């Protein structure tokens, strides 16, 4: 399977870090390999 890239960006204080951590946690629970 090909690698997919997902970019989460925007101005400060909009929850980028929180969104990233929640997304990574959900993917890891589904036994997906993740790199941040």
Curated annotation (Swiss-Prot):
Question: Could you confirm whether the keyword Kinase appears in this record?
Answer: no
EC number, UniProt record: 1.18.6.1
What cofactors does this protein use?
A: [4Fe-4S] cluster
Q: Which reaction does it catalyse?
A: N2 + 8 reduced [2Fe-2S]-[ferredoxin] + 16 ATP + 16 H2O = H2 + 8 oxidized [2Fe-2S]-[ferredoxin] + 2 NH4(+) + 16 ADP + 16 phosphate + 6 H(+)
Q: Which Pfam families match?
A: Fer4_NifH
**What residues bind ATP, as annotated?**
10-17
SUPFAM superfamilies, per this entry? P-loop containing nucleoside triphosphate hydrolases (SSF52540)
* UniProt remark on cofactor binding: Binds 1 [4Fe-4S] cluster per dimer.
One GO MF term, please?
4 iron, 4 sulfur cluster binding
Q: Which InterPro entries match?
A: NifH/frxC (IPR000392), P-loop_NTPase (IPR027417)
Q: Name one GO biological process term.
A: nitrogen fixation
The answer, when asked if Translocase is one of the entry's keywords, is no
Keyword annotations for this protein?
Answer: 4Fe-4S, ATP-binding, Iron, Iron-sulfur, Metal-binding, Nitrogen fixation, Nucleotide-binding, Oxidoreductase, Plasmid
What is this protein's function?
Answer: The key enzymatic reactions in nitrogen fixation are catalyzed by the nitrogenase complex, which has 2 components: the iron protein and the molybdenum-iron protein.
The annotated subunit structure for this chain is: Homodimer.
Family of this protein:
Belongs to the NifH/BchL/ChlL family.
Entry protein name: Nitrogenase iron protein
Provenance organism? Enterobacter agglomerans (Erwinia herbicola)
The gene it comes from is nifH
């Amino acid at each position: 399977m090909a690698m997919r890239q997902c970019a989460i960006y925007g101005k400060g204080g909009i929850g980028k870090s929180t969104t990233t951590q929640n997304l990574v946690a959900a993917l890891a629970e589904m036994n997906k390999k993740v790199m941040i």
